[in-house]
């Protein structure tokens, strides 16, 4: 993929462990701008999903990137393609989608591009970061609640 030097390319991935009763979810980003990695971030929580974590992190990224920017989120998670579509009564995470719609207004353009996971080393890195953060959150929870 040829990168435009003015666009912020945000690789975003998530992970969720549906097999545990406390169901931890996590999301991570690697942000590229002007051909360089400028930041990495990761979040995780209990009793959530990776999609909720990914939308939360998208909002955080849109708040942190300078107003008026061009942002392209790169992911293999088709779910987040609808981050800027008005939620319906059947939409999951309508609260976060509404926040995404609001934050998108601050920028020149914000989009999502679906990429192949196995061909995207930075996307693989985000998944690994999210999985690690999720495991840490779960471990801390169990240590506190022994």
Protein language model annotation of sequence segments:
Residues 1-52, 64:
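RNase H-like nuclease fold core
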Residues 15-21, 59-127:
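RNase H catalytic domain
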Residues 124-146:
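Charged phosphate-binding loop/patch that engages nucleotide di/tri-phosphates or the phosphate backbone
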